[in-house]
Design a protein with these regions (language model features):
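Conserved catalytic-core motifs of GNAT/GCN5-like acyltransferases
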Residues: 97, 110, 115-131
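Conserved glycine-rich acetyl-CoA-binding loop
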Residues: 44, 62, 66-80, 89, ...
């Protein structure tokens, strides 16, 4: 388990979205899916993608790449892998939230086939709003 690496990526990429205990739960709960990319030489975790399986839907809780490795396609690789795995999980949709002002992330998710389906006011700690995004998988 790469707990400390997950916390480091979370702090550097997501401004400490989760606590250590939340990461422990995310990494150990069998109903949660955690994918990572590890650098072979150093065994260092470079990126993470985690999701919850909720009956026939996946809910992405986190996707982040260490700042020194961003813009190299690692986030796309992680999300593509999760989308592929959704087939064996027989999911119908994948859901996530994104800060409504995060233009690079919104463009990324749109390029991966996600569509805006709603919003949540005051969703984040700083009071900012979130957009709800979904991608149809129709894997049943």
């Amino acid at each position: 388990m790469h707990l400390n690496d997950c916390i480091e990526i979370d702090q550097k990429s997501l401004k400490g979205l989760w606590t250590k205990s939340q990461w422990v739960r995310e990494l150990t709960d069998p109903k949660r899916i955690c994918l990572g990319i590890i650098e072979l030489e150093t065994k260092k975790l470079l990126g993470i993608c985690s999701a919850w399986l909720l009956i026939d839907e996946l809910y992405i809780t986190s996707i982040a790449v260490h700042p020194t490795h961003q813009r190299k396609g690692l986030g796309k690789f992680l999300l593509s892998d999760l989308i592929k795995r959704s087939s064996s999980l027989r999911t119908n949709q994948i859901h996530l939230e994104v800060k409504d002002t995060n233009e690079p992330a919104k463009a990324f998710y749109k390029s991966m086939g996600f569509k805006t389906i709603g919003n949540r006011s005051n969703f984040y700690k700083d009071g900012s709003n979130a957009l709800l995004l979904a991608k149809e998988t129709n894997n049943k």
